[in-house]
Amino acid sequence: MEKRNQKKRQQNAHLSCELCRERKVKCDKLDPCTNCASAGVVCVPVRRPRLPRGAHARRLRRISPEDPEASIRIDISPGAGTAADEDLKKRIRRLEALVDSMRSSASQSSNQDQESRDAIESISNETEDASAPTPDSSRMPLGDGGLRVLGLSGPSNLEIGWASIIEDKETTTQLCQVYLLNVDPVIKILHRPSVERWMLQGERYLGFPERHAAVESLGSAICYVAATSLTETQSWARFHATKSSIVARARRACEAALEKSSPLVSPEVTTLQAFVLYLVARRSEDPSRAVWTLMAFAVRIAKALDLPGGADETFFGQQMRKRLWLTICLLDFQTSLSQPSEPLISVVEATASFSPPRHINDSDFSLTTSHDIPDREGLTDTTFSMVSYHVQVAGRLLNFEPSVGDYETRQQHVQQFEQRTLRLLFYCDPESTPYAWFTWHRIQCFVSGARLSAVRPLRHPRGGSTSCMIPLTGTNESAGPLSLALNVLEKVQLVHTDPRGEGFRWFVTVPWRALAIAISECYVCQDRALMQRAWPIVEAAFQQHEAAVSGSSKAISTTLERMMCRIREKLSLTLGTSAITASPTFGITSIATTLSVPHTPPSQSSITSSGDLLSNWPWPATELSHPGPDLALVAGVAPISSSLPKLDPLLHSLDNQLVIAAQEPLVDADQSWAWEEVMASLHHDETIGADMFLS
């Protein structure tokens, strides 16, 4: 009983007196204290129970029904309580005002920092054991449109001068030139002549007033995505700095400009264009799931602006809206492939709203164009983007549409895709420009990818069911999924090794699905010669993929690494130890000397005979007989009866390739289990972890 009474008496602690608190000196807590006695003043002691600290205070607030904003009652000596309480409230209000002001601005001046530190220190000494009250969250400024919640503004302590990259006209001009060379040909959402007149010649952009928030955000987004498209060599040549430093500065400037323009509530299409360019650049720079998450906002904003069905009065506005909506659909499809999820835009909505823009050059129309312009033949500024738009529609149907289950239906979708896209290559000379060369080879890669989707669809198993994969077997081993996957990987490496692909390397990564198919097919392949050709390509692609997603993508990396270990064990017995030990050292720089794809520019006369053509796939021709060795596909195909216009001699025998093999699927468990294991493993990783993988 005595111990309990003693403990109860000790709860009323003798704290520092009022004068020692004001002077911020150590109090010996005597009555009177030594400091007050030596100063000759009246000592006002403070006695009250100690308040809970840390976790105890938080737990008490959770279970307490009292108002959290209620004032703290302090029992002090008579005559001094009112003054102390008023002084404490005054300091708390000053601290709250400083916190609100700090949250409303990105950077703080040195005097504000010192004042806030003094206020915090003063409050800490004044309340000693009390927990500091938190400001009401409803009073937080919301003028940034909510983008701070999305983490776009980055850390609050940005260094001074971070926006100088946008204010520097010379740097902005060079980044705009990089954008027009590297980004605009593949991400076609802006009008090239208008951008040139605005950023290179100093004119106003599309009638917007000077320093409009939407225009400034678009300019900063152009600089950011241009910086991410640079190679290290280009960065040193143009800016005498590393690419990482240029990208970091441009990203901070872009995020600050986006906060100012408030894309979540802005009615301007220009602001959404800036946000989409930010997502493109962020996806190229950051392999995490951030862009996958932010895509939901882009889709919602686009629907709020009525991009899919909105009818603009001018031809210019119609083209810009169609380009922007289809680019958002493309990004939605790409991010869905890079994460274990289905696209946000459904297959029905994507196909119903698919209205491609005109296949024309940007110089063919302007803001004042009042009449319709017909499509052009040959390569235009929008050719690659038009193909990309068709890719996302075909990819959704082949991979995410449950009704497209049988092999014949997928054949029809692939055939329609090839008919629409290969027509865009009419009169395209891959030797004319780097853009033409890149478009030529990427379309071949897209066609191979579509054919892979027909035989190896990306369909996550649900409820224990297996995916609707169609295994292919036959006497011609070079005509199966392995050769299709190898062609995709070779085309990716070609872009990363040929000088003509330097400006577009930022846009091309190793697709994880083609790599996974190649690994799984290599594991069950019985053709020794094909394996000797395929293994260096697969090993190099695996190393490049691992380097690109290092530290951020665990699900697919774990699955691929596990399968690579198994296939290395198998090949060490079949191909010999020398072949396996040499593969891990197969660097990216030596790919050009190992791949079977030609790396020298083909001559005009050799293109139609034995070059790197879609027409070189060994399918039986209906009208022409110019098959070549580049891309092999399934033998015994049915000819297509389509009346396509006659092609330029450059694509002499391309019209007979607009068909996918119409053979009966042959089921072979030995050649189908590997891909099923990949999908099952990815599905398992999806359910047990939050790590995502890069496409």
From Swiss-Prot:
Residues 101-146 are annotated as: Disordered. GO terms for biological process: DNA-templated transcription. It comes from the Eukaryota. PROSITE patterns: ZN2_CY6_FUNGAL_1, ZN2_CY6_FUNGAL_2. It is found in: Nucleus. Residues 101-113 have a biased composition (Low complexity). Keywords: DNA-binding, Metal-binding, Nucleus, Transcription, Transcription regulation, Zinc. Residues 17-43 bind DNA. GO terms for cellular component: nucleus. One of its GO terms (molecular function) is DNA-binding transcription factor activity, RNA polymerase II-specific. Transcription factor that specifically regulates the neosartoricin B biosynthesis gene cluster. This is C6 finger domain transcription factor nscR. The lineage of its organism: Eukaryota, Fungi, Dikarya, Ascomycota, Pezizomycotina. The gene is nscR.
